Amino acid sequence: MESDAKNYQIMDSWEEEPRDKSTNISSALNIIEFILSTDPQEDLSENDTINTRTQQLSATICQPEIKPTETSEKVSGSTDKNRQSGSSHECTTEAKDRNIDQETVQGGSGRRSSSDSRAETVVSGGISGSITDSKNGTQNTENIDLNEIRKMDKDSIERKMRQSADVPSEISGSDVIFTTEQSRNSDHGRSLEPISTPDTRSMSVVTAATPDDEEEILMKNSRMKKSSSTHQEDDKRIKKGGGGKGKDWFKKSRDTDNQTSTSDHKPTSKGQKKISKTTTTNTDTKGQTETQTESSETQSPSWNPIIDNNTDRTEQTSTTPPTTTPRSTRTKESIRTNSESKPKTQKTIGKERKDTEESNRFTERAITLLQNLGVIQSTSKLDLYQDKRVVCVANVLNNVDTASKIDFLAGLVIGVSMDNDTKLIQIQNEMLNLKADLKRMDESHRRLIENQREQLSLITSLISNLKIMTERGGKKDQNESNERVSMIKTKLKEEKIKKTRFDPLMEAQGIDKNIPDLYRHAGNTLENDVQVKSEILSSYNESNATRLIPRKVSSTMRSLVAVINNSNLPQSTKQSYINELKHCKSDEEVSELMDMFNEDVNNC
């Protein structure tokens, strides 16, 4: 704990001191002496904890596999060996005379959240500086993020002078050391520090970055942001159909971008290539020298300082070569305003990102729905159609902006509604035409029926005339009479003489015609017979059936059947009597049957 407190005091004193080259070197030497005075075992344990912490922090970020690196050992009197690493992760050096392993990790995976972050901080795309100790020949490397620098420096006047990753560092009395082609393909500052051979010409003299360098970096980022925003707005206007104005504005923006790009590519070859951040030479008592250079990538990503630390890796879509622009004279207050405006722009970018994701989901669902319904075969064939509705659908599916999608959808709905109205009018006109045709058909059918009736009547009249002509033909011998003769002669029915049969009512009426000889007693006459004058159903003795003895069955059959039918007996008994009457063969059987009939009538 005491060592940590001393370490914090030394670091705080080093940050609060005025920034000169001499003060930087002296304060750095003090820190190195303090670190070397501590126990190496504690440093190793601390390094282990730091390594474990960095692994925990970087667990969610997808990193390429770290290839095993080799360690170089240097013995006194041995020749210098040049080694350049082709991968993004480089090896560390190991001093044979001292059993102290110093591991410096650089990259996005090595983010430290411990209390020793003031002494050693490693951030991707940050500012790196090296501190050397000429006595013991050890070296500590410090990589600090720009965002953390702004948090630590509360006062702009007392801001810390650090070296920028995008500005070349010049070493007095020596040439600039450039990186190799392999280091250009590195993963943007997330690799381990490479090892290079000691350069006798390079000295441990480092030029610190000035506020102008920081302003220059901010200007570069803001300019890149503006150019990207202008391209996005231009795309939106073109998709919405802005017309000639959008095209003129797009040409102007392209001209301005070309001018800025030409001005950016003017610097010398020193600015075009990425130089090594720090080169230090250390000599120990035995005469062994060790140099450790931190080579950064040649292509720096067009990183946006507004993006958070969690999403900066996935959203770096374009890379631009590092360029050096003429130093501007912006004030430090403008830098503060830029830093204050970060959260607002960050929120707007987050909303735009959500809108784009939702629009992409919408387009995917719409495309799948249209393909399933069979409206379209593929999205590539939408551009081949010339129909207004299909063009609107293609604009909706291909456009990213939700506002323009809504506009095209509104146009599509209006076009569909107008088409439906026209189709409805056509259908109504067709229905009216069909009704008119039906009326015409009904009228023609009615006329046809009338004609058929007229023809039928004409045919019947012709047939009748033909019949008259045939009947009258061939009868020339007939004498003509003055009497009127009908044109149509009909066959007359012959009059048949009807034979009146005997009816018992004839006796009551006094009709003497057709009186049958059916008297029971031969001596009785009609005048003296009382039974004949009485009613038929008055009594048994007065019944006509009792005294009727038919001479012939056929002559009396109907009269007896009529008597039975006029009785009050039920129909079944009547029918049975009639059937029995037909089977009678003699007058005795008839008389017995009629006696039974009279008994039944009296009992009723």
UniProtKB/Swiss-Prot annotation:
Region of interest (Interaction with the nucleocapsid (N-RNA)), residue spans: 585-604
A Pfam family per the record: Paramyxo_P
Region (N0 binding): 22-42
Annotated stretches, region: Disordered: 1-22, 39-360
Polar residues bias locations: 47-61, 74-90, 129-144, 197-207
Coiled coil regions in record: 424-451
Chain intervals for the UniProt region annotation (Multimerization): 400-470
Bias (Basic and acidic residues): 91-101, 147-163, 245-267, 330-360
Keywords linked to the UniProt accession: Coiled coil, Phosphoprotein, Viral RNA replication
Function: Essential cofactor of the RNA polymerase L that plays a central role in the transcription and replication by forming the polymerase complex with RNA polymerase L and recruiting L to the genomic N-RNA template for RNA synthesis. Also plays a central role in the encapsidation of nascent RNA chains by forming the encapsidation complex with the nucleocapsid protein N (N-P complex). Acts as a chaperone for newly synthesized free N protein, so-called N0, allowing encapsidation of nascent RNA chains during replication.
Notes concerning its domains: The N-terminus consists of a long intrinsically disordered tail. The central part contains the coiled-coil multimerization domain (PMD). Forms a four-stranded coiled coil structure. The C-terminus constitutes the alpha-helical domain that binds to the nucleocapsid (N-RNA complex).
Family of this protein: Belongs to the respirovirus P protein family.
Protein name: Phosphoprotein
Organism: Human parainfluenza 3 virus (strain Wash/47885/57) (HPIV-3)
